[in-house]
Amino acid sequence: MGIQGLLQFLKEASEPVHVKKYKGKTVAVDTYCWLHKGAFACAEKLAKGEPTDQYVQFCMKLVHMLLSFGVKPILVFDGCTLPSKKDVEKARREKRQTNLQKGKQLLREGKLAEARECFSRSVNITSSMAHEVIKAARSEGVDYIVAPYEADSQLAYLNKNDFAEAIITEDSDLLAFGCKKVLLKMDKFGNGLEIDQARFGMCRSLGDVFTEEKFRYMCILSGCDYLPSIHGIGLAKACKLLKVANNPDITKVIQKIGQYLKTNITVPEGYIEGFLRANNTFLYQLVFDPVERKLIPLNPYGNDVNPEELNYAGPNMGDSVALQIALGNMDINTRKQIDDYNPDIPQLSHHRSQSWDNKQLNRKTAHTDSIWYTKSEPCKTTKIEEIHSPRGLILPSKKHTVKRSYEDGVSDTDLISQYSFSKNKKARPDGDDPMQQVPASTMILQPLDDCANTKPKKPIHQPKTRNAFATFLQRQKQDCSSVSATGTRSRFFYKPADEKPHCTEKEQIVCNGSALDIAKETHELTEESSIKTEKEDSLSTISEVCKPNNQRISPLQNQRSCFTWSGSLDSESSPTPKQSPMLLSLQKFHRTTPYMQNEAENKPSWQSSCIKSDTVSQIDSNEKLLKKQDIEDTDSDEHASTPESPCQFTMKASPAHQSFFPEPKGSAPKSKVPGLLKSQSVVSGLRTKVKPRAPAKVSGLTNRSNTKATRNNENVPGLQATIGDLWKNFSYKK
């Protein structure tokens, strides 16, 4: 069936597509191809004569698939046998009868597999089987038409006259009839191979010189249902012949076919007449116009064509008979009345429900947009989705369709309100400080207005922010924006006027590598006004707060600090602010160390704390080393302190490692602060001995101590090497 090798020959013009490409449009279907596929599943029952409707279910399943994608199908069935195909139909009938007899014989012998194969080849689609599919399509409001003769010519007419956008078939003869778009090899999912006539120029074998007429000649020469081919002539040689021959008369080209192809090919007698009959059959085969409801040729007759001589293309049976055949009311073989369907009478169709929102659409009558309706337009390719809406397709209509609401679901209004800003939201005043909204528990160090004033302010209850820690870091970044990113600053060019009183706040500490922010409330303690009064106090405070006008705290000091003060040593100090419940729950994990005092030397001993520690022995060894270094640094810093600045201490090391502040040498023994251990990362970084800082230089660098007494000094002549000494050291002995 069809033209052998044509699909492979037009491979470059084909394109794999899905049927949803034609959503909202109308397609015509060669239903006999579907009937043959559906009959294969029940071939054994059909051969035995058992009743079955599997082929009907198969065809309607494909119809429902097209409707689900918004495609309106028109089912086209074959009619009477065409006189031009009597020989072909006779040969096919004999072949089917032979396979049927062979299958019955194999079934008697018990060879079931071979018998089924023979039965599948012997399937004959009868008019009664087609009528069962017609009744099923009619009940669901699907358009159909029975061709007066062949379905191929009727499909081509529907496509050329814009009744259908494309043709769904398995027969390649549709291309020879001049169809614009043909969808071949479509499966049950809607995938197929589309061949568009507009893409024929992409085929290298055809070239740009081929026209629709030459393409039809090529198909006839290569062999079709109306005329067998000449021995040795296929699509390739037929295409080559039409490219080489310049004579417009095709009969003369066929006579000289051997000269054009340079082969010894003889044209059989009667071949030219058969060629002309086949060409006229492709052009003037009778079809039925559903709008005018009469028989017409596929293409208008030419001036040199006599319709009475074209009986081989289908004799004129009359418009009334053709109408009854087209409606499926008359048997095509016996011409007996088998049904009384009238498309002009509105009938209630039982559509298959595709979704929840198209039940009302299914109640529409079938004749409203049918091709049989006399007031309908020929083109039915627009707005077809209003009749058969696919699953989930939102159709434009005045009525608002309401979907089923899910239980415990969020409505669309609530969902939109979650992603939109409220219009009644009050704007924050310009004077509001984002730091005021940060709870007191997030403040590591609280700034003090005066060193002597140690009374903490009452925490102000502020509404909880979305991310207080992010606000805190943003405020700290703005306050410390003038500080160098590396934390280094020349002490020579330093001016007290550049100091800002803030930047004393620290970030929260994340210990043990977790995301838990442990915020501990601390007190800023100050020292007494002079060194003499400090010696008389029984307790002194440990602070890292200095006067803002005299000394600037390095930003690296705030960033590298891994501990905070957790209590007060002064009995006269104000009470500790109320801790948060989170801190109270974590207080049981607070680690404390025994007091360490050195009464013999009355020197302060320092003790650090860290929540994350590997071993206790490593921390104790580092504490002893730091204790010894701090005592030595205290002795060197005692001479540098003056009565004018009693609270100011000289920084012992670089700002990156500054975490301890010494007290004057003559101070009374201090009580130890429990639970203050330095983190291991900081302690491990101070393994080398911290040297006391020398007086400030212009370059801002510390002066290294002169370890060698014999070092050359250019300012002292006695220590310089003279030329005579050099000659003595490097002279050779005689």
Curated annotation (Swiss-Prot):
GO terms for biological process: DNA recombination; mismatch repair. It is found in: Nucleus. Its EC number is 3.1.-.-. GO terms for cellular component: nucleus. The keyword DNA damage applies. Residues 621-641 have a biased composition (Basic and acidic residues). Binds 2 magnesium ions per subunit. They probably participate in the reaction catalyzed by the enzyme. May bind an additional third magnesium ion after substrate binding. One of its GO terms (molecular function) is single-stranded DNA 5'-3' DNA exonuclease activity. The keyword Magnesium applies. InterPro entries: 5-3_exonuclease_C_sf (IPR036279), EXO1_H3TH (IPR037315), HhH2 (IPR008918), PIN-like_dom_sf (IPR029060), PIN-like_EXO1 (IPR044752), XPG-I_dom (IPR006086), XPG/Rad2 (IPR006084), XPG_CS (IPR019974). Keywords: DNA damage, DNA excision, DNA repair, DNA-binding, Endonuclease, Excision nuclease, Exonuclease, Hydrolase, Magnesium, Metal-binding, Nuclease, Nucleus. Residues 604-620, 700-715 have a biased composition (Polar residues). Mg(2+) 1 binds at residues 30, 78, 150, 152. Residues 1-99 are annotated as: N-domain. Its cofactor is Mg(2+). It comes from the Eukaryota. PANTHER family: EXONUCLEASE 1, FLAP ENDONUCLEASE FAMILY MEMBER. Belongs to the XPG/RAD2 endonuclease family. EXO1 subfamily. This is Exonuclease 1. It comes from Xenopus laevis (African clawed frog). The gene is exo1.
